[in-house]
Amino acid sequence: MKRFCIACALILLQTLWGPLDARRFSISTNLLDYARLGTLNMDASYAASRHWSVTAGARYNPFTFREGDPDRQFQYRQQSYALGARWWLWHTWSGWWFAGKARYQEYNAGGLGDRETEEGDRVGAGLYLGYTHMLAPHLNMEFGLGFWGGMSWYTRYSCPACGVVTDQGQEYFVRPDDLMISIVYVF
């Protein structure tokens, strides 16, 4: 009886899950995000059909540079989470794609260019366009760009370390988001 129940459960799982064929999942990392003061990032995707994939991603940057010298300190600290979907013109993991994402970001940025620092939270949605080039059966290179907009709750300071508040509030924003050159592993 136990074997029968296990067999029924496996058949039910395969029926609900769909066919277990190759190239349904991928993980990727955007190489250009590392140039943004060492922002660590990872995306995971699932091919829901031939033309659609769903994606989830995270970015994390805990780094503060020149922390011991308040006059020269700078940072782009953040944690960011996104959920989205892609529509592929040809088929998933190859060719042109369009995407939409919902995103949350907690950030603290400043000290580069001018001394003003801003920290806060952003919530919004974005639109993206890109191209994925197949390098090998399981390895792709991805190029893309996008914009996102939404609501920002912020506090601005006169410098990265002094704590003097110059402004705070909330505002709508539209800004460039991803400039992507990503390595993608498909499995």
Name each model feature, range by range:
Residues M1, T29, G100-A102:
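Generic cytosolic/nucleocytoplasmic N-terminal low-complexity/intrinsically disordered segments
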Residues M1-R24, F187:
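Cleavable N-terminal export/targeting peptides
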Residues G18-P70, Y172, L179-F187:
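Short glycine/proline- and aromatic-enriched beta-strand/turn motifs that initiate or cap beta-hairpins
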Residues R24-I27, R66-D69, G110-G113, C162-Q168:
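Extracytoplasmic loops and strand-loop junctions of Gram-negative outer membrane beta-barrel proteins
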Residues Y46-F143, S182-Y185:
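Gram-negative (and chloroplast) outer-membrane scaffold detector with strong preference
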Residues A136-F187:
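Predominantly the C-terminal beta-signal and adjacent terminal strand-loop region
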